[in-house]
Amino acid sequence: MSPLWVRRLCIRVVDSLYGSFLYLPLAILFLKRSVTGFGTGEWDESQIPKLDGKVAVVTGGNAGIGYYTVKHLASRGAKVYLGARSESRAKAAIKRLLEENPLIPQENVVWLRLDLANQSQVVDAAVELQSKEQRLDILVNNAGIDPYDYIRTADGFEMTMAVKYTNPAAAAQEESDVRVITVSSSGEAYSSPTNQFTSPKDLDDPCASPGWENSCLGQAMRYGTTKLANVLFASELQRRMDEEDANIISLSLNPGTVRTDGAANVMPFMVRPLVRFLFTAPERGADTSLFAATAEEIKENSERWKGRYLDGPGRIKVPSLRARDAVAGRNLWNITEAAVRGTGALDRL
């Protein structure tokens, strides 16, 4: 048997074992739901304060958690830019949202063409936003990735820079309340153990061993590395904003086991049908994002919340050891910024 065939056989065996291993946590999840349910605690969207006059951007706002994040922000008076790549899907989502919620003014939900895989197009969106608005109060980096794709940039980097540049007075206004929310997941704990974000290659191909790229393990590792990057990015953003005395609060979060296409795609094929029955609905999954973006207690006690990782509305959790690696966070920021600056994108903001 040739070495190539031996390698392929080993990959298939390990991948099958990995896929089978996922049944155990799903079984535990089922038992937990049977006994305790999937409640998110005492906080829900009814506690969102009035947001009249505020401007928000929600990436990936046309479906899943993002859709319900847009819905509840707009219903409380915010003007929400629904960031999405597909015009037809975005407008269909807006049409559905307005039909289901006739009290939301039509002008409160606006499509923002936003393809996070295209840096130039993301900057176009940021420039468009700056031309239309004098402020940006809330950015929810919610858009996920397809686990079959490689990571190209830290999710939402350019839009996060737009928050900073669209709010030049944020550092001087003590009463301002600007928040950047980055949606991660508990999958951040299952990233590649060797990835330290020391080179652009660590973003492009987190599963460096040849042959594993499209395996179940490779897809899960790619997903986990993306989610790890989300947490590191949010923490590093907060550190930098604090250094500049900018009144910007950065949070990352785990929305929970939510019934979305992204969650299903990470699972082995034979497990995916169980997602529908075991995972919670996207509307409930949006609660943590909404708490992070709007809860008044975060503004009132900002030092307690700055840079934190939430595991439910109002629940601060210590993320994995790797997600607390400040050096990796700085490395991630630096290689991402270098990659974006190399395109000339930031010069346009």
Swiss-Prot record:
GO CC aspect terms: membrane
Biotechnology: applications noted: Diterpenoid pyrones display various biological activities and FDDP E shows anti-HIV activity. FDDP D and FDDP E show also inhibitory activity of 42-mer-amyloid beta aggregation that is involved in the pathogenesis of Alzheimer's disease.
UniProt keywords, alphabetically: Glycoprotein, Membrane, NADP, Oxidoreductase, Transmembrane, Transmembrane helix
Matching InterPro entries: NAD(P)-bd_dom_sf, SDR_fam
Location of the active site: 191 (proton donor), 192 (proton donor), 223 (proton acceptor), 227 (lowers pka of active site tyr)
Swiss-Prot/TrEMBL GO biological process terms: terpenoid biosynthetic process
GO molecular function per UniProt: oxidoreductase activity
Pathway connected to this protein: Secondary metabolite biosynthesis; terpenoid biosynthesis
Top-rank EC class of the record's enzyme: oxidoreductase
Primary localization class, coarse: membrane
Assigned EC number: 1.1.1.-
Residues glycosylated per entry: 118, 334
The protein's role, per its UniProt record: Short chain dehydrogenase/reductase; part of the gene cluster that mediates the biosynthesis of diterpenoid pyrones. The first step of the pathway is the synthesis of the alpha-pyrone moiety by the polyketide synthase dpfgA via condensation of one acetyl-CoA starter unit with 3 malonyl-CoA units and 2 methylations. The alpha-pyrone is then combined with geranylgeranyl pyrophosphate (GGPP) formed by the GGPP synthase dpfgD through the action of the prenyltransferase dpfgC to yield a linear alpha-pyrone diterpenoid.
Protein name: Short chain dehydrogenase/reductase dpfgH
